[in-house]
């Protein structure tokens, strides 16, 4: 499985990778830490899943979701965030995110990834 991970914080990036590995998910991860790197990655390869921080210093998660929908509309997108309010969570799901996971509750990431991939496969088969 090829994942594009948009995360500017190295420690969080490593924690997300470790969590995915501990969940038994075998994946190749491409990292992006800025809008430019994310955009270039979207243009250079096809991904099975995109995971993005909701809040980045110079780029919003919603903008990243929008960009991914334009270039890879069928790729599931999951937000991770330290804090995400109810309004932001609803906005992200309405905008096309498959799910969101709080960084303090990363034990739910594996389940969110599996569900997002399963739902994307079901949509593709229709």
Positions of PLM-derived features:
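N-terminal membrane insertion elements
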Residues: 2, 8-25, 32, 40-125
């Amino acid at each position: 499985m090829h994942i594009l991970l948009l995360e500017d914080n190295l420690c969080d990036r490593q924690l997300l990778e470790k969590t995915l590995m501990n969940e038994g998910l075998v994946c190749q991860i491409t990292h992006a830490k800025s809008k430019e790197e994310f955009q270039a990655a979207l243009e250079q390869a096809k991904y099975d899943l995109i995971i993005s921080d909701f809040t980045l210093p110079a780029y919003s998660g919603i903008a990243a979701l929008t960009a991914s929908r334009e270039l890879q509309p069928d790729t599931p997108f999951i937000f991770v965030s330290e804090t995400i309010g109810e309004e932001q969570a609803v906005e992200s799901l309405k905008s096309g995110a498959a799910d969101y996971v709080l960084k303090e509750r990363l034990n739910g990431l594996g389940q969110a990834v599996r569900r997002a991939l399963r739902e994307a496969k079901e949509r593709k088969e229709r």
